[in-house]
Amino acid sequence: MVPSPALVGTPSVFPHHQSTSFFQETASFFNLDWERLWHSRSNSNSTSSPRNSPSQLSPPMAATAALRRSSDYGSADTECGEPCETGAPVSLNEVDLLAKMEQLNKSNEEDSRSVASKKTGSSESRKGAREHSPEEDEYFQEDLWSVWGELILNWEIEVKKRPNYIKDLVKRGIPQHFRMIAWQNLSNASVSSVHDLYSDYMRQSSVYEKVIQRDIPRTYPELDFFKDGERGQSLLFNVIKAYSVHDKEVGYCQGSAFIVGLLLLQMPEEEAFAVLVSLMENYRLRELYKPTMTDLGLCMFQLECLVQDQMPDLYTHFNNMGFDTSMYASSWFLTLFTTTMPLDIANRIMDCFLVEGMDFIFCISIAILQQARIELLRLDMEGMLKYFQREVRERYEFDADLLFTVANQVQLNAKRMKRLEKDYLTKRTKEQEEAVELRRLRTENRLLRQRIDYLEAESSALADRLVKGQVNLAQEAENYINIAHELNKLRDMNSDVHRKLEGAYETIRELSSARRDNIMDTGTQVDDTSMIEHIHSLQQELIEAHTRQADSENTLRDAKLRVSELEMANKRLLENEPSEDVAGLQEELISVKMREAESSLALKEMRQRLAELEQHWAKYVHVRAFDPSSASIEKESTSEAHSTQQQPSPPLTSARARLAKITASLIGGSTEETDNCISVRELEDQLMGVRIKEADTLAELKEMRQKVMELETQNHVCTNQLKRQDEEMKRVREDSEVLVKKRKELEDQLKDEKEKLDNKESEFNEGRINDRLKYSEAMQTIQDLQSSISQLELKKAEKWTQNQLRGSSVCDLDEESNSHGSICSNVDHLSLASDEMNALLADMTVRIPTLDDLAEEGSATETDELRPKELNDGNDTTDSGVQLSDSH
């Protein structure tokens, strides 16, 4: 892209409808002789001085001034070209171009966004007006503009020849009118091909449009250009939206809006978009604005390490206060100080950023912290936050040169920065791995907890089932025992009833025999009434006995049925094999009971052994109380017997010694052995106490072994439960897989049915559409027929009125009757056609009976109207005249 000659004295932000066409129109103008052109212009405007308005200086005159003052910049020997001819004529095209340049200069002065505007001057120009005299300021501006004008004209050559010189010039500050072209050239946006894509991006939609619209009012709210309703907000939205479409990975970040706004204050939106793309791709801003913001964390880490190296006391103060680097420096890197510094300082920072890149942001950050170190050491966290938000801006608003001077003195070690980058990446990788491992462990822990809860619930359910089963069995056994007791009672009652019945029968027989004997012996008659009463009472007793017998038989029968049912149920329970879980639990219960029985038996034996020992000890004590010698002998014998039991092969000498002691005690021995009797008894007592303690310890040992067996049994039971639960889980998983397969099959069937339904609906819709088309065609035909009928009726009425007025002859009437006949035949034909059409409409699926009825009624009324007219046509002229008069 060829630099435009209009950068000298042109507005910093061109109107959008003038910028593109004007640059294309004047692109070939750089090949002309600038000094010759300016000489002709100065001759034509001799009354105006070129020093009066710095905005109207031409690049050739600025280049000549730069050659005179080359000692100030140290490069005069390399900037001059061939001498220019000042007396050469100027063409009309060049004069037109100069006129356009003057017009644009005037529009620049009237533009509120331009730094050269008469309405809103920049803070730099106001400050310079206060510090310098107008002549010095004008001379300085003319000198600086001349250098930059020559530099912009020969940009491609100067960049290759003197890059360090350009870098120094940029650090001193780019003039406001040259920033648009200088930023494009420094960022290589002038040769980029993204200008052509901007219009395509504007026609596309972005997913970030709502977020962008929300954040636009927050961007530079103090500037009039970006207030509500102004053109700046629409331009800002367009550029940010275009970049979100251009780079879908980055999309939109709020910090980019301030950089775009800074660019829009200097150039049109297409050029701002090109510079933004270049900044994103070539100056690490794209990595800053990615959703992960990895590069932002790296910058924070590097800045923190730099502060630790250069200002350890401030670093310690920040750590003690819990003041993280991202709390004050994240906006510096995301917005390039556009939200922290005034606009003119932000422009100068952007100038140096385009030359040095992200390293200059580090330098500015270190410079701010160095100058504010003493004040920050006195503040707490809230004070430091307020300081970075307000006081930093106020401090450098009128003293920007100090900030840039200190920043230029800051030296960054490239190797140190690379090493910090490697350390940060290593640390981040380690943190990510630890986070992944932590998430995995948490997931495992959650799954294990779920499995433990599930197993505990299942084990509790199984235990409940086992307890319920045992309770049911106990209840059934108790019911069985109760029923057996009831059966025995009923049997006893039945036997008693049978005995009573037999006794009653025997009593009856005895009474009857006694009666016969009395009758035969005495011959006396018994009172009939008493006999009858006695018989009745006996009969009543007999009936009651029969009733009791029947009740007892019924009760016995019910008891037998209940017993048979219980026996069948018990037999069925014994024959049916229990389930695997119940069988396992029964086996485990049996093994536990067996172990418990063994342990209890061992415990009983141990207690019995202990009781025997205590009894033996009591006996020994009793005997010794009455006969010490015999007690000692018995004790020795018992001790020897125990020792022989515990030690099957004792030494021979000890056995002989004990035998000698026993014999000596029996025959009276020597006096020395009798003297030692007391000590022997004490030893025997101690030995017996030790044996009793040994028995106690053995008992405790067996109890501990019993507890160990119980714990092993519990462990075995838990292991079996876990195995069964794992098998149950496998079975449930298999069932779930089968259900998933069935679900997939059903879903496939559902999809097929939906497709069939869609096909049927499409066929039905096609049929409805065809029927509607047929119906519309039929209605159109009916309308055509009705219109033809109405036309024929009109013709008929016209002819009839003409004949009535003329008083036509009978021949005419005959002809007319013939014509009426033809009309009637046509009408009949039309009625036939309408009948066919009605039949067609009746066969259609779309039924509208009202229209068919109207058509039939219309045809009927038409035929009824035609018939009296035909009759009237057959009358003579007198009748027609009478009718005419009547009608009139």
Swiss-Prot record:
Domain of life: Eukaryota
SS bond partners: none
Ranges in a coiled coil: 694-770
Effect of R179K: Grinder formation defects are rescued in 4.1% of animals in an eat-17 ad707 mutant background
Feature: compositional bias, Basic and acidic residues: 124-133
The entry's keywords: Coiled coil, GTPase activation
One GO CC term on file: cholinergic synapse
GO biological process, one term: regulation of presynaptic dense core granule exocytosis
Residues passing through the membrane, by range: none
Tissues expressing the protein: Highly expressed in the terminal bulb muscles, pharyngeal muscle, in intestine and vulva.
Compositional bias per record (Low complexity), positions renumbered to this chain: 41-60
Gene3D superfamilies given in the database record: putative rabgap domain of human tbc1 domain family member 14 like domains, Ypt/Rab-GAP domain of gyp1p, domain 1, Ypt/Rab-GAP domain of gyp1p, domain 3
Domain Rab-GAP TBC: 173-357
Entry-linked InterPro entries: Rab-GAP-TBC_dom, Rab-GAP_TBC_sf, Rab_GAP_TBC_domain
Statement: the UniProt record of this protein carries the keyword S-adenosyl-L-methionine: no
Bias (Polar residues) ranges: 114-123, 874-888
GO molecular function: GTPase activator activity
Stretches the record annotates as Disordered: 41-87, 104-135, 631-654, 854-888
Oligomeric form and interacting partners: May interact with rab-6.2 (in GTP-bound form).
Protein role: Rab GTPase activating protein for the small GTPase rab-6.2. Required for grinder formation, which is the feeding organ that breaks down food.
Name under which the protein is recorded: Rab GTPase-activating protein eat-17
Species name: Caenorhabditis elegans
The organism's taxonomic lineage, starting at the top: Eukaryota, Metazoa, Ecdysozoa, Nematoda, Chromadorea
Designated gene of the protein: eat-17
